[in-house]
Amino acid sequence: MIPVVIEQTSRGERSYDIYSRLLKDRIIMLTGPVEDNMANSIIAQLLFLDAQDNTKDIYLYINSPGGSVSAGLAIVDTMNFIKSDVQTIVMGIAASMGTIIASSGAKGKRFMLPNAEYLIHQPMGGTGGGTQQSDMAIAAEQLLKTRKKLEKILSDNSGKTIKQIHKDAERDYWMDAKETLKYGFIDEIMENNELK
């Protein structure tokens, strides 16, 4: 169930679903697994807000366990494509593709709430049953290319070397807010809508 908010206007009352009301304030909620439908919705909202006024920041709140690499990179590419700065605010968790998206916010405008967590790891993939060996080799090669691409993005976003990212992402690498700040993925820890 999506909450509805009532707003008083000069013409009377107007009801909005909560996400539409937040969008009026340039707030986008990226929650749950990153997948194509969710990514298309996020991209449409980014493009809409940028077309509306590209001199104002967009606020992207993130609570995601990650998901599809292609869907996540489509969001990141759109964040980089538009003129508006995209502030990222991690609440809860930014894991896997969630980390790639969150760390790709405008430099100096990447935030995290104090009890949120970050996770980096190598990308996962599979070919499913009944796959012939040559297709498995192709899938493995593509997975290596994807890993290199994601490690480059994380390196650019954190200031860490690709070698360090590769080492840390070999297994699940969890970070709390202070560790994420020290690592370079965020710029500030936010508490009570104030920077800490």
Swiss-Prot record:
Keyword tags: Cytoplasm, Hydrolase, Protease, Serine protease
Catalytic reaction equation(s): Hydrolysis of proteins to small peptides in the presence of ATP and magnesium. alpha-casein is the usual test substrate. In the absence of ATP, only oligopeptides shorter than five residues are hydrolyzed (such as succinyl-Leu-Tyr-|-NHMec, and Leu-Tyr-Leu-|-Tyr-Trp, in which cleavage of the -Tyr-|-Leu- and -Tyr-|-Trp bonds also occurs)
Ranges in coiled-coil conformation: none
A single MF term (Gene Ontology): serine-type endopeptidase activity
A cellular component term, taken from the record's GO annotations: endopeptidase Clp complex
Domain of life: Bacteria
UniProt-listed GO biological process terms: negative regulation of DNA-templated transcription; protein quality control for misfolded or incompletely synthesized proteins
Primary residence: cytoplasm
Compartments reported by the entry: Cytoplasm
Top-level EC class: hydrolase
InterPro entries (UniProt xref): ClpP, ClpP/crotonase-like_dom_sf, ClpP/TepA, ClpP_His_AS, ClpP_Ser_AS
Active site per database record: 96, 121
Function field: Cleaves peptides in various proteins in a process that requires ATP hydrolysis. Has a chymotrypsin-like activity. Plays a major role in the degradation of misfolded proteins.
Oligomeric and partner information: Fourteen ClpP subunits assemble into 2 heptameric rings which stack back to back to give a disk-like structure with a central cavity, resembling the structure of eukaryotic proteasomes.
Family statement: Belongs to the peptidase S14 family.
Protein name: ATP-dependent Clp protease proteolytic subunit
Organism: Streptococcus mutans serotype c (strain ATCC 700610 / UA159)
Gene that encodes it: clpP
